[in-house]
Amino acid sequence: MEELDSESNAMSQMELTQQALICGLPDDLAVFCLARVPRKYHRILKCVSRRWRDLTCSEEWYNYRRKQNLDETWIYALCKDRSEQYCCYVLDPNSPRRCWKPIERLPPRSMKRKGMSIEVLGKHMYLLGGCGWCEDATDEVYCYDALANAWSEGSPLSTARCYFSCEVLDEKIYAIGGLGSNSSDPHSWDTYDPLVGWISHSDPNIVPEIEDSFVMDGKIYIRCGISSVTSHVYAVVYEPSSGIWQHADADMASGWQGPAVVTDGTLFVLDQTSGTRLMMWKKGTRVWVPVGRLSPLLTRPPCRLVAVGKSIFVVGKGLSTVMLDVDKAVNVEGVMVSSSIPKLNSDDDVISCKCLTI
């Protein structure tokens, strides 16, 4: 009988040992250690055991790294290749050997569409809407889990739309304007809360043809095309406290003539009308001031902007990428000193760039 009890205890002890994340360590201490492994090695961690894979794909892992300030930001770029198919690449901006790498293949149904948007909320990147030559605007949404490196179907939009703008504010995705089906409201916008789903709204100040957007000071700004008659830039701003869209500051809107990005509360715009020149909006004096020009040898317009911390990344055709620190930006003979990242061998057009932090 004692022998059976001893064997049972040994089996129980073995099960506990097998279940431990790291043999001989309590799980909380194991998580403390594993969470400090740089993000670029997380794919390797998943191969060690099923428990490690489950951990590194879990909300617990995501929340722990975020709370301990261990999370790292990577840049994701949605591109379109020569065959008019969508593809997506990722860049680790802190890697000593920075280069763009393809991520898990996009869902087949979305690869040939046009007018799709991407947005990031938490550890997920969403691929929204779109249309085709023989396909009306769709409400389909696909969700990419950056921890699991896998795509799944997401909650569909309230309104089918394509060629629209997306932003995140107060932990919600805003899908604004664009073209929809014949029955859809051209002045509509949708909000997505993961706990509630999509809710549709309407405002007469929303117009379908949106070219750019950004979030600054807790407000969403959208810009439409420049009028060929008046050269006037139509821009509106959303105030979440009132739920109303109203016309944006005319002086600010007048200089918003290219892709925009906000870093540390400051708005920057890339003027691509003659070369590539970075402009900065001075809130206090309400004027646009030039930061400097970028070397034409490094940039390949049309470009997109994305910011990580105080560094701005200018991403152009073929994912040619220029990185500059706005606090340390230096001009030499009118050209900004910057570092660059090798482009791909292809000439893919960059549709949008977003940051995802894990």
Q: Language model features by range: what are they?
A:
Residues R97-I103, A150-E153, G197-S200, I244-H247, ...:
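Predominantly a core beta-strand signature of beta-propeller blades
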Residues A30, H42, E72-W74, Q85-C88, ...:
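A common structural microfeature
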Residues I22-G24, N63-R82, P107-L128, V141-C143, ...:
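Conserved short beta-strand element of beta-propeller blades
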Residues L21, L25-T56, W61:
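Short hydrophobic alpha-helical "box" of cullin-RING ligase substrate receptors
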Residues M1-G24, F32:
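CRL adaptor-proximal regions
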Residues C87-S95, D139-A148, P186-V196, V233-S242, ...:
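Beta-propeller blade signature
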Residues K80-R105, D136-A137:
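Beta-propeller domains
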